Amino acid sequence: MSDKYYRSAYMNVDLNAVASNFKVFSTLHPNKTVMAVVKANAYGLGSVKVARHLMENGATFFAVATLDEAIELRMHGITAKILVLGVLPAKDIDKAIQHRVALTVPSKQWLKEAIKNISGEQEKKLWLHIKLDTGMGRLGIKDTKTYQEVIEIIQQYEQLVFEGVFTHFACADEPGDMTTEQYHRFKDMVNEAIKPEYIHCQNSAGSLLMDCQFCNAIRPGISLYGYYPSEYVQQKVKVHLKPSVQLIANVVQTKTLQAGESVSYGATYTATDPTTIALLPIGYADGYLRIMQGSFVNVNGHQCEVIGRVCMDQTIVKVPDQVKAGDSVILIDNHRESPQSVEVAAEKQHTINYEVLCNLSRRLPRIYHDGDQRFVTNELLK
């Protein structure tokens, strides 16, 4: 990855904010391992730089969704434990062993297939975390008998290590009894067998709202980056999280639309009076979606409307006359009260803050801020 970039749109990522949020969870759960979830490119922030900074601040365990994500971390010097939360094709089992990556066991059948695919030349250990489906209805084992049988199979092989067991809450960010029911179901199943080194069930919402003394690890994701899983969670907790992302574009051109002139595809905006517009070199290919037409961005402290359709690579904004090329524009801000907060963008897009962040594409340079230090990552120039 290069430390150069040649475009006027980029992300600012506050690594100190991420480290502060990590410390929040370490303080809330002092006797538990914090498995920092850095899947989906660390929710859009950049998994390598985030994981490296978290390791420097005490992280010892990461969770990702795919083996590819785990290998990316290994290739860039991340030596901490890594768990793949998704399902690895059984034929690729040796690659996980080679890179010392723990895997999720979603079913007895998967385990049997995985064992068949371990080459005779492999002598390294394979760490396994069994996934229990306690109500999410996705991956995992639903009954105690099968869970016990899977453990028995693992114990037959010296190379296999039953390292963990976990489940995932479906409604931890909402009011209701389902999360408590899932937690008790999880405890009941785990208590019917030998206990592994790691027992974990709390996502960001669960980690903020629940104690879960039965568990000895937590898996915060979105909240590591400074964002609450829902408004309900934000209102229920007194924990202060620090948002870590800004999305910035610099004006590349200004011009005046005369009355009757239109702008962008479909000519959906037509000026009624002489109107100054600014062109921003960012669009839906960067994760700033077409639905953001009609929203507002911060131009030199002025709230300015996005007019016309957002294009693949460009966005048009109605601005004061004094705005000029080179001026900085905030499209997403790292202040929760800002009109450009991630939550405001999520509401405009009829989605959740997770998706807004994950949509920020890899073609955007990431500028990382660590105190007075500044680092640039451009994944297009490797």
UniProtKB/Swiss-Prot annotation:
Cofactor(s) the protein requires to work: pyridoxal 5'-phosphate
CDD domains in UniProt: PLPDE_III_AR
Alphabetically ordered keywords of this record: Isomerase, Pyridoxal phosphate
GO MF annotations in UniProt: alanine racemase activity; pyridoxal phosphate binding
Superkingdom, natural source: Bacteria
One GO term of the biological process aspect: peptidoglycan biosynthetic process
Catalytic reaction annotation: L-alanine = D-alanine
Enzyme Commission designation: 5.1.1.1
Keyword Amino-acid biosynthesis: no
Active-site residues per Swiss-Prot or TrEMBL entry: K39, Y265
Top enzyme class: isomerase
Residues involved in substrate binding: R138, M312
Pfam families, alphabetized: Ala_racemase_C (PF00842), Ala_racemase_N (PF01168)
Listed GO CC annotations: cytosol
Modified residues (N6-(pyridoxal phosphate)lysine): K39
Pathway: Amino-acid biosynthesis; D-alanine biosynthesis; D-alanine from L-alanine: step 1/1
Keyword match Heme: no
General function of this protein: Catalyzes the interconversion of L-alanine and D-alanine. May also act on other amino acids.
Listed NCBIfam families: alr (TIGR00492)
Family membership: Belongs to the alanine racemase family.
Full protein name: Alanine racemase 1
Native source species: Staphylococcus aureus (strain MRSA252)
Gene: alr1
